Design a protein with these regions (language model features):
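Active-site-adjacent substrate/metal-binding segments within catalytic domains
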Residues: 22-107
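Short, solvent-exposed beta-strand-terminating loops
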Residues: 11-40, 172-180
Length: 183
């Protein structure tokens, strides 16, 4: 169909870090709210420890297999790939001043791989997950300090991935953020 040949048509797909990456504690990543929610269940977020059966630890292992997955997306002719950055990969606790260099390196490599295959990354900064420490210590989004933590995280992303990411989204499904159980 001619619609797919249009220059302004974004042919692609979407995932989120918390849905596909797995590797929930590798390379310095901290726990996030998504890591500790039971599979397929929304509700109160409670602190858990590694080894708990409720932690989502593998997913589709995108963290280790993203190059294969991006190559498959290119085979399908994708021109765009919407994904997210796990805030707790860059800032394991969420309130650090300096980002985790291994988290930066992973996402830089991911976005470079997309570009190598002619795929434009479209990146969501917060896809229902925040570092668990921010929930336990500050009460998450009920605390105005979260604005500063998020701003620092966002600026870090913009600087670290400048030239690799052209399109940014702040929040996924922001209409759900009114719920105290969301995170």
């Amino acid at each position: 169909s001619d619609v797919y040949k249009r220059q302004d048509f974004l042919w692609g797909g979407a995932t989120a870090a918390n849905q596909v990456e797995g590797a929930y504690l590798e390379d310095g990543k901290g726990l996030s709210t998504s890591d500790v929610q039971p599979h397929g269940v929304f509700g109160e977020v409670v602190e858990r420890v590694p080894g708990d059966s409720g932690i989502k630890d593998v997913a589709i292992d995108f963290y280790h297999r993203y190059k294969e997955d991006i190559a498959l997306m290119a085979e399908m002719g994708f021109s765009v790939f919407r994904t997210s950055i796990a805030w707790s990969s860059l800032f394991p606790r969420g309130d650090e001043q300096q980002p985790n260099p291994q988290g930066i390196a992973f996402y830089r490599s991911l976005f470079e791989e997309c570009k190598k295959h002619g795929i434009e990354p479209l990146v969501t900064l917060c896809h229902f997950d925040v570092p668990m420490h921010l929930v336990m210590e500050y009460g998450s989004w009920r605390n105005r300090k979260m604005v500063d933590f998020f701003s620092h995280y966002a600026r870090t992303c913009f600087e670290a991935f400048d030239g690799l990411v052209k399109y940014w989204l702040t929040f996924n499904e922001q209409n759900l953020y009114h719920s105290p159980e969301a995170f």
